[in-house]
A protein has these predicted regions:
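Gram-negative (and chloroplast) outer-membrane scaffold detector with strong preference
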Residues: 37-41, 49-55, 81-156, 231-235
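Short glycine/proline- and aromatic-enriched beta-strand/turn motifs that initiate or cap beta-hairpins
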Residues: 19-72, 235
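Residues that define the transmembrane beta-barrel architecture of outer-membrane proteins
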Residues: 39-41, 70-74, 119-125, 139, ...
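Flexible, solvent-exposed loop segments that connect beta-strands
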Residues: 54-68, 99-120, 151-171, 206-221
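Predominantly the C-terminal beta-signal and adjacent terminal strand-loop region
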Residues: 174, 182-235
Length: 235
């Protein structure tokens, strides 16, 4: 899937490159899609990458923190855009996100048992406000921020087993706030919008082990999502 996503982005990028120089950076660019942003509602889709991690807080000083190794995941989803004012839009961007984090727990004596692979498939539902600057030629930068709700399809929330049998458990539903920036690039037939966004979990997502003195979860006060999303949106 990652290779397919890279291929799609590469082909799209090569196809756009010929237009990009003449239509965006020339001295007198042809203004594309001049009235596109005046639509009350418009739709799109996105492809992208993510890097998810966790922020741990501890009950007592652990000496050595839980080590979080982040990997690159992928995103795909839809975009619905509602124009509120000239420079303000409301956006809904439901998407499917896949990611993996490798956690190493220093309090576990057995080196092999320290590692937990946390693979997650998320249904992600952000509701965002988009603040756009004045359009210059075929470019229009913007800021975006808001709240999101995430459904973790691989949370193991209802599992009876815990880390002592290799099962890492998380809460199924989480809430986040998000903040980022991007730029709208107007081509002849479509608008392309690369963006980068940070995701910050609001509540503890960890389900503790059955043993309150577990070396995995006993000293953890909270575990919250931290993520970076890079999306390439086509309208």
């Amino acid at each position: 899937m990652k290779k397919l996503l890279l291929y799609i982005l590469l082909v799209t990028g090569l196809g756009c490159h010929a237009q990009f120089g003449t239509q965006v950076f020339s001295k007198d660019p042809i203004i594309n899609l001049e009235n596109f942003d005046k639509q009350r509602v418009h739709w799109g889709y996105f492809l992208g990458f993510n890097s998810y991690g966790f922020k741990f807080d501890y009950t007592n000083d652990p000496g050595v923190d839980v080590v979080v190794k982040q990997t690159t995941g992928f995103n795909v989803g839809l975009v619905g855009n509602l124009r509120l004012f000239e420079h303000l839009d409301l956006r809904f961007e439901p998407g499917l996100y896949y990611t993996q984090r490798d956690l190493s727990f220093p309090d576990v004596v057995d080196e092999f048992d320290r590692l937990r692979e946390v693979k997650s498939t998320y249904l992600h539902f952000p509701l965002l406000l988009k603040f756009s600057a004045k359009r210059t030629g075929n470019l229009r930068p913007y800021l975006v921020g808001g709240f999101s709700r995430t459904l973790n399809l691989s949370s193991n929330e209802k599992a009876q087993d815990d880390n002592l049998t290799g099962i890492f458990r998380m809460k199924k539903m989480t809430n986040n706030w998000e903040l980022g920036f991007g730029v709208d690039v107007y081509f002849e037939y479509f608008k392309f919008s690369p963006s980068i966004r940070g995701v910050f979990g609001l509540k503890d997502e960890l389900i503790r082990d059955n043993d309150p003195n577990s070396p995995y979860t006993g000293n953890i006060e909270s575990m919250k999502t931290r993520a970076i999303l890079v999306n390439f949106t086509f309208h």
